[in-house]
Amino acid sequence: MAEITASLVKELREKTGAGMMDCKKALGETAGDVEAAIDWLRKKGLAAAAKKAGRVAAEGLVGIAAAGTKGVAVEVNAETDFVARNDQFQGFVASVAAVALDKGADVEAIKAAACPGTDKNVADQLTHLIATIGENMSLRRAVRLEVSAGVVASYVHTAIAPGLGKIGCLVALESTGNVDRLNEVGKQIAMHVAAANPLFLDPSVVDTSALDRERNVLTEQAQASGKPAAVIEKMVEGRIRKYYEEVCLSEQVFVIDQENKISKVLENLGKEIGAPVKLAGFARFALGEGIEKEVSDFAAEVAAQAGTRPAG
């Protein structure tokens, strides 16, 4: 029997797109014969994944996992919304979130980690799912929040299963106060994040280029009024404060009570539980944001296959 070398496995992976463990098994089953191993993988449906890799995957699920002082959000994409309702796919996304909670948010480290409940790593299990379900899929991104004391609270908007949905949010609250109350308010703020979509945690971390751009626009708008420079400066500063209220979580008006800023909500919570509460971080994953979806022109597609031009 031929030795199953790393170069043989690499060659088979490049030719088929199948996972490393599947390639090793195929070569073992075929005495190291690459061509026979390709056929073996094709019969098992595992070589099909490579053909699907070029297709746009903008659907799928966001997965959330939180435990005490840490929480994670992951996004796993597929081609159609139908796959999001598949039990195998849902189980995989939940597993990826569990791995990220343990291993951290580095996507490559997550892919290399063992996938719970399988004999494969996450990357190979993903390849297996692609072949089984028949759609291109990808582990797109992950984020993990952690505090030394306090909670990382979570919320999934319109969850289709526990911890799974199309928008997932995390809020990190640092405090030595009552954990139950921190969790309760933290979840409400996570709901706020889902609805209000803040861009920054607080004014201190607003991107300077974004702020400069906003200030330039507002200054030009104010100058058009013809008012004195001192008045214009006050107008611009007022509008900058308004800008902070729109984009900074700490400055936004809490959607639950429609009255207090988030910073005030946490100040009041700190008084209630007898310990200061710091807004330490947040994350909001919306499924498919930033992915350019293909718009199919069916007539053009058929015409291209037929070698003709569409009428019209």
Curated annotation (Swiss-Prot):
NCBIfam families for this protein: tsf
Gene3D superfamilies, alphabetized: 1.10.286.20, DNA helicase RuvA subunit, C-terminal domain, Elongation factor Ts, dimerisation domain
Keyword line: Cytoplasm, Elongation factor, Protein biosynthesis
Subcellular locations according to the entry: Cytoplasm
Native species: Paramagnetospirillum magneticum (strain ATCC 700264 / AMB-1)
InterPro entries, A to Z: EF-Ts_dimer_sf, Transl_elong_EFTs/EF1B, Transl_elong_EFTs/EF1B_dimer, Transl_elong_Ts_CS, UBA-like_sf
Biological role: Associates with the EF-Tu.GDP complex and induces the exchange of GDP to GTP. It remains bound to the aminoacyl-tRNA.EF-Tu.GTP complex up to the GTP hydrolysis stage on the ribosome.
Matches recorded under SUPFAM superfamilies: Elongation factor Ts (EF-Ts), dimerisation domain, UBA-like
GO cellular component: cytoplasm
Similarity annotation: Belongs to the EF-Ts family.
Annotated protein name in UniProt: Elongation factor Ts
Predominant subcellular localization, coarse grouping: cytoplasm
Single Gene Ontology MF annotation: translation elongation factor activity
CDD domains registered for this protein in UniProt: UBA_EF-Ts
Region span, Involved in Mg(2+) ion dislocation from EF-Tu: 80-83
Gene: tsf
Pfam assignment, any one: EF_TS
